[in-house]
């Protein structure tokens, strides 16, 4: 007989493995009681085998009538509290609390093992679950009779996939359409899986077509899917690993949960705000489960003194991963001794405190486990009160610990760092390490002993483990927390311990691809001279100043604001994006521009009688029309209400200046309008505000007035897959810096030692100033060029030394003394302003003509590869003073206008004809069809040059602009290439 490749056979493989290898019982559909929505016989068997005294005291099974009363109340408890809560906390009936599950035992407790073995894991095929329908669910898993999981299986060989299983859940397993199907109702079953032979998706709450299925795949090659399994189908890990008894118990005890969050929402009828409880049913995704388990295993095996870097994409559920890790780290034991005394979560998100506390309290009745510390006293109190998890803000943490000092050196800590790239600047991490290690040098008499204590304290401490989470690791973060990987050439790369890449998150549909619809606009300006004379200015600085001048002009902002408002209404709101709920963000380069944009957008919204309004967001206050204003003054409501109000009408457009560009989680955000330079981490973090998913969100949109697509592509590529540090930082760069500084003879070796002796012995401040002031006076005698080089090198040393001290064993007492000396000296050195050779420029010019024109509309493609980054750079102090390049204003403006002014409207006909001309070029068509995009682009640009030269007789003006202006040429080439290449790629 040929091999059975049916869906039924896949079902057989799964069920038989659980039965024969994982110790499950195999049940039948008749075991399931449709009236109560559970396996009443197994519930009864479990209780009778473990809690006979409670059964006797309550007479719950004394008669069919009593039994019915018991199961009626039991079923009601499942509906109200949820299956995971009933399993964890038991079920109260009359005078007794019935345990419904016995947790995983420790190795030291044989009695607990006996109880655990009484748990009944059961798998059932073809469960007929409804009183009204004859439908059956392919696979059903229960624990002690309680529903844990359902599965719909599909099979590629019979032409169906996981998508068909999802469709079946959405259309045929709608709980509202069949109220008698209790297993489909909210909270009654922990999770529902759609499974085929390649992929797994999961859903914790069925809502018909609104059901949200998340991936439960391992990932392959940094992307979606599952790797090839040598012994079976790709998804066999589900029944061979995840559904093993110990594994499933672990998930139910430590991960699965129902969380509740109170939120104020506006009543649409009354207009008043009302409190609403948002309920979330959570089951871990595979990467979260795998990450936390690997970290726990490494901690259990390696003890303290380790460091781990977790590179998880934005929007990948880091908050839950951190919560699950923190909760379980405090429970790890070495024999009977806790491996870690306290876990400290360092974050820049205040709301993480509430989230972790709520999540942990959903696991067990532990009201005193978590606390928040915002001062040294609250930290002391938390430690003395036995708090096991303490949350604090990144900037307060080192100073809090510094106050505790040597009291901590005998404690073992787990330090979980949320968004590690932003929390490990040199001085903060150094203070953290010194405090945790207890090496504060307070009781040492000799300077050398003090310095040795401080140097030792700067290193990554041995009485703590570091768990650093970030989506965008910088070189410093990779070296501090990454896993060292020596290479054959002698270099030492550093890699993440665990990763969930941006590529995988996008491919799995968990976050949106924010580069899919990326439109660039170019601003073309013509600036004229308004004075009779022809004054001279620094040519290079003048070009920057003129650009800033025209960008901040009211007419420039007005034209861009008009594009924003028109696009948001016609292309976003009118098209019903996110079910008509779409929001937008406008990213500006300064507070003044943000305020200008806000008022222009508000005026344009009123002009078109739009029902919607804008909000402006910035920190502090700014002078506007002669008075100081804050965001609250302009918006008319407190700053704390901005996030909440952006989720409620009439507010739809958020205008920001260095605010809400990180950490802002609003799934309704659909469009972003960028009028600010973005690069590297800032580009990824800012644009990633759009990537949060929503059941009705199908796409996102970016309109960029400032950045070209190549720059954005490079920024995202760095973090698309694994980010690898190419080599470790070189401590010898510190010697290069000190060599440069000491050329200027602003201090002596004796002065450095004298100051350190006094400083570390805590003398009166007056004894330090005379020493430092000598160096200041010598510095003032240097020429301006030497001052710039010297001060730059001092700052470079101060940036680099704390980092090197933390990650290498090569630090010296001389470096530590110089660090102290420079730290005090740099604050007293005079500011080096330099002469402004553009002073008065703005009074001599005016904006004559302005055009803001769409240049390209494309998807920015990222390459399927890891990215190596170089070690942390350090300034060399070799810059010195730059001599101004003086030029006449007329020449400066001619150069500026050559670069920035093209009369697009005058050559629009020629520009519009280019796509058809390029599509008719056979050399380009062949390259587009038969080679990669990069090769096709090179040929496209070559073909464009030939096409334009042939157009010389048609329009000399267009050809002159194209051939003479490289910026214009590149913009036209990019625009036309993307348009035509996209058509050819799609076979159009």
Language model regions located:
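Conserved C-terminal RecA-like helicase domain
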Residues: 547-656
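Inter-Walker segment of RecA-like/P-loop motor cores
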Residues: 361-402
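ATP-dependent helicase/translocase motor core
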Residues: 2-342, 351, 355-366, 395, ...
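Post-DEXD/H (motif II) to motif III coupling segment of the RecA-like Helicase ATP-binding lobe
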Residues: 425-514
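Conserved segment of the helicase C-terminal RecA-like domain
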Residues: 689-718
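Catalytic cores and motor modules of nucleic-acid processing enzymes
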Residues: 44-69, 270-274, 306, 332-334, ...
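Conserved RecA-like ASCE ATPase "motif II neighborhood" in helicase/translocase motors
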Residues: 387-419, 423-434, 442-456, 635-643, ...
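Interdomain helical connector at the RecA1-RecA2 junction of SF1/SF2 helicase-like NTPases
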Residues: 229-232, 476-581, 598, 602
């Amino acid at each position: 007989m040929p091999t059975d490749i049916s869906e039924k056979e896949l079902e057989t493989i799964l069920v038989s493995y659980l039965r024969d290898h994982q110790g499950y019982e195999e049940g039948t559909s008749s075991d399931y009681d449709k009236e109560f929505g559970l396996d009443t016989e197994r519930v009864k068997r479990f209780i009778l085998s473990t809690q006979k005294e409670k059964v006797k005291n309550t007479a719950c099974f004394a008669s069919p009538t009593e039994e019915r009363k018991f199961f009626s109340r039991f079923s009601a408890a499942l509906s109200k509290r949820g299956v995971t809560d009933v399993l964890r906390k038991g079920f109260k009936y009359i005078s007794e609390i019935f345990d419904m599950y016995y947790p995983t035992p420790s190795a030291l407790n044989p009695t607990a093992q006996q109880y655990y073995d009484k748990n009944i894991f059961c798998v059932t095929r073809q469960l007929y679950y409804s009183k009204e329908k004859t439908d059956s669910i392919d696979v059903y898993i229960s624990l002690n009779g309680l529903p844990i999981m359902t599965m719909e299986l599909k099979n590629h060989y019979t032409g169906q996939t996981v998508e068909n299983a999802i469709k079946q859940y959405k259309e045929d397993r709608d709980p509202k359409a069949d109220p008698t199907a209790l297993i489909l109702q909210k909270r009654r079953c922990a999770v529902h899986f759609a499974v085929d032979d390649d992929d797994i998706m999961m859903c914790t709450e069925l809502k018909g077509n609104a059901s949200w299925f998340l991936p439960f795949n391992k990932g392959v090659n940094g992307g979606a899917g599952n790797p090839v399994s040598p012994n079976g189908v790709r998804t066999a890990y589900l029944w061979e690993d995840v559904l093993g008894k110990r594994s499933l118990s672990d998930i139910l005890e430590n991960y699965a949960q129902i969380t509740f969050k109170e939120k104020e929402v506006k009543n649409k009828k009354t207009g008043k705000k009302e409190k609403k409880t948002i309920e979330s049913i959570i089951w871990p995704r595979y990467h979260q489960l795998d990450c936390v388990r690997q970290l726990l295993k490494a901690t259990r095996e390696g003890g303290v003194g380790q460091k781990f870097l977790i590179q998880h994409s934005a929007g990948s559920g880091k908050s839950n991963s951190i919560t699950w890790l923190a909760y379980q780290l405090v429970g790890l034991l070495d024999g009977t001794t806790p491996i870690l005394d306290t876990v400290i979560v360092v974050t820049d998100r205040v709301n993480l405190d509430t989230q972790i506390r709520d999540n942990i309290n959903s696991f067990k009745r532990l009201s005193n486990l978590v606390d928040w510390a915002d001062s040294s006293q609250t930290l002391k109190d938390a430690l003395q009160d036995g708090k096991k998890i303490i949350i604090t803000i990144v900037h307060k943490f080192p100073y809090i610990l510094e106050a505790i000092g040597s009291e901590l050196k005998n404690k073992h800590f787990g330090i979980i760092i949320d968004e590690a790239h932003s929390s490990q600047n040199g001085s903060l991490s150094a203070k953290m390490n010194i405090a945790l290690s207890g090496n504060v040098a307070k009781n040492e008499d000799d300077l050398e002993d003090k310095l040795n204590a401080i140097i030792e304290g700067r290193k990554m401490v041995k009485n703590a483990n570091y768990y650093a989470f970030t989506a965008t690791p910088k070189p410093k973060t990779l070296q501090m927390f990454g896993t060292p990987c020596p290479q054959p050439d002698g270099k030492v790369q550093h890699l993440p311990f665990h990763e969930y890449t941006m590529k995988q998150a996008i491919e799995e549909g968990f976050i949106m691809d924010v580069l899919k619809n990326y439109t660039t606009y170019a601003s073309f300006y013509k600036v004229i001279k308004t004075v009779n004379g022809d004054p001279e200015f620094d040519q290079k600085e003048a070009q920057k100043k003129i650009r800033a001048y025209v960008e901040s002009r009211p007419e420039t902002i007005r034209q861009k604001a008009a594009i924003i408002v028109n696009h948001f209404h016609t292309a976003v709101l009118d098209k019903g994006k996110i079910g008509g709920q779409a929001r937008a963000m406008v990213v500006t380069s300064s507070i003044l521009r943000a305020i200008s944009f806000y008022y222009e957008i508000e005026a344009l919204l009123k002009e078109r009688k739009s029902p919607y309004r804008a909000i402006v967001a910035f920190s502090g206050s700014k002078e506007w029309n002669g008075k100081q204003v804050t965001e609250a003054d302009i918006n008319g409501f407190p700053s704390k209400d901005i996030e909440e109000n952006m989720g409620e009408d009439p507010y739809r457009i958020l205008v920001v200046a260095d605010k809400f560009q990180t950490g802002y989680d609003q799934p309704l955000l659909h469009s972003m309008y960028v009028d600010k330079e973005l690069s590297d981490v800032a580009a990824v973090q800012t644009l990633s505000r759009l990537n949060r998913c929503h059941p009705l969100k199908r796409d996102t949109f970016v309109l960029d007035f400032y950045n070209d697509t190549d720059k954005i592509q490079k920024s995202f590529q760095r973090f698309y897959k694994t980010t690898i540090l190419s080599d470790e930082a070189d401590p010898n760069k510190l010697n290069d810096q000190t060599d440069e500084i000491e050329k200027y003879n602003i201090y002596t070796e004796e002065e450095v030692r004298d100051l350190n002796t006094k400083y570390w012995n805590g003398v009166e401040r007056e004894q330090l100033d005379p020493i430092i002031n000598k160096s200041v006076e010598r510095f003032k005698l240097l020429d301006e060029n030497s001052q710039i080089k010297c001060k730059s090198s001092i700052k470079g040393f101060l940036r680099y030394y704390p980092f090197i001290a933390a990650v290498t064993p090569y630090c010296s007492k001389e470096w530590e003394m110089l660090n102290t000396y420079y730290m005090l000296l740099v604050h007293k050195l005079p500011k080096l302003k330099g002469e402004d050779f553009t002073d008065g420029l703005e009074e001599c010019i005016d904006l004559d003509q302005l055009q803001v024109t769409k240049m390209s509309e494309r998807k920015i493609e990222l390459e399927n590869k890891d990215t190596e980054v170089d070690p942390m750079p350090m300034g060399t102090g070799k810059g010195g003073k730059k001599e101004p390049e003086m030029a006449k204003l007329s020449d400066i403006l001619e150069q500026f206008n050559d670069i920035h002014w093209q009369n697009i409207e005058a050559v629009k006909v020629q520009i519009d004809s280019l796509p058809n001309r390029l599509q008719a070029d056979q050399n380009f068509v062949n390259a587009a069809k038969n080679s990669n995009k990069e090769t096709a682009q090179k040929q496209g640009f070559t073909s464009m040059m030939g096409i334009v030269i042939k157009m010389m007789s048609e329009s000399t003006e267009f050809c002159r602009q194209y051939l003479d202006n490289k910026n214009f040429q590149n913009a036209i080439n990019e625009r036309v290439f993307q348009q035509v290449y996209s058509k050819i790629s799609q076979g159009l």
